[in-house]
Amino acid sequence: MPSLYFGTELKLHKEVKPLILAFISGVESGKIKKNNMTPEEEKRVDRAIEILEESPIYLEREPNYDCMFLENMIEKYVNQYEVGAIMIDYVELTPPMIGEYTRMTRGLQAREDSILLNVSTVLKNLAEEFDVFIKIYTQISDNARRDHTIRDSGAIKGSKSLQVRADLGVVVMRPVERELSMLKPLIDLYGEPNICLNIYKNRDGDLGEFKVWGRINLGNYHFEELFITDWSYRPFREKIEKVYLHSDTKDEFVSELETDTVHIMEDDDLPMFDEETGEIIEEVRKPRGIRRSRS
């Protein structure tokens, strides 16, 4: 799918492009920037460059933007390049936004929450009008960095009105020691996470608030999911649908998955949980499947 990255801070060719090449190749961006790679890594990066050049990925940068700029940019890339996914990194209050809102409201006091709510509304309308996926990033407040219990819209720096129109809201943070101690039974089974995706808003989703724990390599942004919990750090106990395979294809199917990024678990591999608390009451051996990078 043709995609657009719109940035406000990072330099596109010196900072963003190496990150994309790192993700495609699996070679960490620091090595790419310093040209400190092995011959094998150089081959992978060269191939990643070819893939990127052949891919419909477009990059734009503009620190001082307003809603009209976003509307014109999105319309241009949808109509000219058939873009279907747009990433905005990141949304914050800008002087052009303040001026635009003041003119629109004929001098009404331009409060930050009102302006960002307008931005959220405009982006939601553009997503619906052009039938595109729009993902925006914003900054985390200092309070959320200090307090691990703030992992919802209260973690947004500036104003949480920015997420009002969003269908999905996620706060991405490193786990603190207190959280890791509460997760010890799961960590013993699946490994220790260094990142958590706190999904606090999931409109029309089967799950409400939940947390996805995983490991991320910040050098190439490869992410490995480890386990999922509810907002109280208890593992989910969802119904698992069984898939039955013909004996002739089962071994081949399982082998293919286990060399990808999926854990294959037999029934007796699954831990037993307390019905009331969700705590693990019987630990079992680790699953047979081993997660491996696709690269």
Can you name each region flagged by the protein language model?
Residues 14-16, 94-100, 143-147:
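Short acidic/His/Gly/Ser-rich catalytic and metal-binding motifs that mark active-site loops
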Residues 8, 91, 139-140, 174-175:
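Short, ordered loop/turn segments at secondary-structure junctions
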Residues 58-126:
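Phosphate-binding/switch loop-helix module in NTP-utilizing enzymes
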Residues 12, 16, 37, 41-44, ...:
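Helical mechanochemical/support elements of P-loop NTPase systems and associated helical scaffolds
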Residues 5, 87-88, 132-139:
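Structural recognition of the conserved hydrophobic beta-strand(s) that form the central parallel beta-sheet
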Residues 26, 31-32, 67-75, 79-83, ...:
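C-terminal regions of RecA-like/P-loop NTPase motor modules
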Residues 4-6, 58-60, 135, 170, ...:
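Hydrophobic/aromatic beta-strand patches that form the interior of the parallel beta-sheet core
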Residues 2-82, 212:
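Cytosolic-facing regulatory segments adjacent to core modules
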